[in-house]
Amino acid sequence: MLPTRDEAMALIRDGLSNNPGPWGKHSLTAAHCAEKIAAACGDMDAEKAYVLGLLHDIGRKFGVRHLGHVSDGYAYMMCLGYDEAAKICLTHSFNNHTINEYIGKFDVSDEEMKMIKTELARTVYDDYDRLIQLCDSLAGAEGVLDIEDRMNDVKKRYGFYPQDKWDSNMRLKQYFEKKMKKDIYLVCEKDSFVPEEIG
């Protein structure tokens, strides 16, 4: 189950009132990319893709956490009955289905870690999981970024970027470009899209 676009935006506004930051505009950019790519694929629901892109980082509502935003987002969406959004909160950080590739601090309790590992192990990825992983790697707070620039930015901030995850993001880009038969940056309006202010 998923909220509507308007309900999802209300959740983002509420999240930003609790924890303001660039994650809001990053989420808008991810949602924009997801909607455009899904529409260009022809066999995906663009509205669903938009909502999933918008809510992938909703765990940031609860404060500045690294791995914790994954468990916070998953638990929050499950609590509201939005299981499809909860799945994306979990899967967007793990391209290769392993917690070992997470970039950032493992700032979770033993219970949260167990939940992430358990749910991740039982999760089967689909094209929506893959799409939001890609869009997370394209989305900056200021707009659509070159995927390699975005990964280098993350590498600079955290000091490393796992090669497996880097390679996976490049494969995702190729996968969706092949599916669309179009350039990802043209579809996502890289040179013109700017996320709106969230008020």
Predicted regions and their residues:
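A short, charge-rich alpha-helical start-of-domain segment used by transcription regulators
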Residues: 22-24
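Generic N-terminal amphipathic, Lys/Arg-enriched alpha-helix
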Residues: 5-19
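Acidic-glycine-rich active-site phosphate/pyrophosphate-binding loop
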Residues: 1-8, 48
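Charged phosphate-binding loop/patch that engages nucleotide di/tri-phosphates or the phosphate backbone
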Residues: 160-199
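Active-site helical microenvironments for divalent-metal-assisted chemistry
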Residues: 7, 101, 157, 164
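Divalent metal-dependent catalytic cores for phosphoryl transfer on phosphate-bearing substrates
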Residues: 13-16, 40-154
